[in-house]
């Protein structure tokens, strides 16, 4: 791009560069010919209005150079008189008026009183409107806000003096350029300002009292009625008051622009705020009415939404009486109990014991094992079922003791066939563990003296241990 500037720089465009040169502080006086050339470019190019407003905003924003501000205001004044609505509508936006021009009134910029009055005159004059349907609502809002803050605007009749001073600075200004007074005669009413006499002020106050009364009635009706259960007579009256309030608000806005009396202006601003709140309340009321009517037109949808639970039915708790459901995890346990309860311990069931290291008192071991078992697994296990026909004479009697049948320590037949126990499998962990341990000859082994066998038990134990040791050594 020309001049080595980025596209975001407002001065990068050809029009922006012209505005930068025309408002430079090194220029002694306004170059009206250059100003007219800028106006022609704005009117003949599509992006001219946007580029011009961006360049002017950059020149004015945070600028402490009074000369550049004065030249920029002169260029704005000429462009507003000679450019079309596309440029004028951008200038009267709140973004430019409030965020750019009004900020120059801050005391830190120390603008001369003449320059400050010129800015205020622009705001007041623009708020009165332009031909061509330019929306001036935003600049009018800024004007009313300044009035509310107590800012005193200079009369528009004083603008010719300002222009006359500007003419003295530049005697070479072309005569074809219209001045501010000519603009006022074109776009402003014949009587831009009104000086109210006491009779007019009294009549205005009476009309404002009527507006206040209407606002109170509207507020009371809105508070007493709710959408869906409203009184038709009240609603009809409310509609009439709303229509009248809209008309009164337009008149108040017009009076705020032309009335010079400060006390009257303050009163108009206050009444306008109250009336605006009542109008907004009525519009909110009508929106709620419309929403209720739409819901009544679709009652099925409303019923469906109201009857739907807040959570899925599968997640809701059933607080009613429910029959107890058996827990599935207890099924295997109950089946095991049923199988074990049918067993008879005194029958020819295999009993797994440690054949190599039997206890000295197997009956006491059984008692200890019965104390450690889970009672629910053996509900039908009693001392009568475990009673045996063989007992020891030298063993002390216990009230709850249960005696076992004698068990042989070898696989050879040492008892009648009816009392014989089946041998353990060769891969049983008991036999595997015993095969890894050397034989011990110092353990006292107890045997049943009543058993019908005469074979030496110790020899067979030694033989079995030796066989296990040999197999272990071979591995």
UniProtKB/Swiss-Prot annotation:
A motif (SH3-binding) lies at residues 421-425. Keywords: Cytoplasm, Endosome, Golgi apparatus, Membrane, Phosphoprotein, Protein transport, SH3-binding, Transport. GO terms for cellular component: cytoplasm; cytosol; endosome; endosome membrane; Golgi stack; membrane. InterPro entries: ENTH_VHS, GAT_dom, GAT_sf, TOM1, TOM1L1_GAT_dom, TOM1L1_VHS_dom, VHS_dom. It is found in: Golgi apparatus, Golgi stack; Endosome membrane; Cytoplasm; Membrane. Residues 22-154 form the VHS domain. Residues 392-395 are annotated as: Interaction with GRB2. The modification Phosphoserine is found at residues 170, 313. Its main location: Golgi. Signal peptide: none annotated. GO terms for biological process: negative regulation of mitotic nuclear division; protein transport; signal transduction. Gene3D superfamilies: 1.20.58.160, 1.25.40.90. GO terms for molecular function: clathrin binding; phosphatidylinositol binding; protein kinase activator activity; protein kinase binding; SH3 domain binding; ubiquitin binding. Residues 165-175, 300-310 have a biased composition (Polar residues). Residues 155-175, 296-317 are annotated as: Disordered. Belongs to the TOM1 family. Probable adapter protein involved in signaling pathways. Interacts with the SH2 and SH3 domains of various signaling proteins when it is phosphorylated. May promote FYN activation, possibly by disrupting intramolecular SH3-dependent interactions. Interacts with the SH2 and SH3 domains of FYN when phosphorylated. Also interacts with GRB2 and PIK3R1 when phosphorylated. Interacts with LYN. PANTHER family: TOM1-LIKE PROTEIN 1, VHS DOMAIN CONTAINING PROTEIN FAMILY. This is TOM1-like protein 1. It comes from Rattus norvegicus. The lineage of its organism: Eukaryota, Metazoa, Chordata, Craniata, Vertebrata. The gene is Tom1l1.
